[in-house]
Amino acid sequence: MAIRYPMAVGLNKGYKVTKNVSKPRHCRRRGRLTKHTKFVRDMIREVCGFAPYERRAMELLKVSKDKRALKFIKKRVGTHIRAKRKREELSNVLAAMRKAAAKKD
C-alpha cells in the first residue's frame, strides 16, 4: 500500500496509520503436509508398496513415455491435476531408485 501523507485530498488523504496484519486463517492450512502425516504415508508405502496401476505407470516412465503415463494415470485417478501430481511423485521415486542403485555399485 502507498505511503500516506497528511493531505486533505487525493488518493493518499487521511491519517498515517500502521496496517494491522492479521494471522492467516486456520482453514488456509488444509491440505498442507505435516510431519506426522508424511511419516504415516511413508510407513504405509514401505509396507504395502505400489498399486498395480502405479507400477505400470512407472514402467511407462522408465521408457520415457511421459505423456502416455499421464493419460493412463488420469484415467485411473480422475483429474488432470491429481494425475500430474502422481506422475511427479512416481518419477521422483524412480529417480531415487536410480540414485540408490548408483550409490550401491
Curated annotation (Swiss-Prot):
Q: Does the keyword Cell membrane apply?
A: no
Supply the Pfam families for this chain.
Ribosomal_L36e
N-terminal signal peptide = none
Q: At the top level of its lineage, which domain of life is listed? A: Eukaryota
User: In UniProt terms, what function does this protein have?
Assistant: Component of the large ribosomal subunit. The ribosome is a large ribonucleoprotein complex responsible for the synthesis of proteins in the cell.
Alphabetized UniProt keyword annotations:
Cytoplasm, Ribonucleoprotein, Ribosomal protein
* InterPro entries per UniProt: Ribosomal_eL36, Ribosomal_eL36_sf
The family line of this record is: Belongs to the eukaryotic ribosomal protein eL36 family.
Task: Summarize subunit and interaction data from the UniProt record for this chain.
Answer: Component of the large ribosomal subunit.
Q: Which GO terms describe its biological process?
A: cytoplasmic translation
**Protein name, UniProt field:** Large ribosomal subunit protein eL36
Give the CC-aspect GO terms: cytosolic large ribosomal subunit
Which species is this UniProt entry from?
A: Gallus gallus (Chicken)
| Location of the protein in the cell | Cytoplasm, Cytosol; Cytoplasm
Report the GO molecular function annotations: structural constituent of ribosome
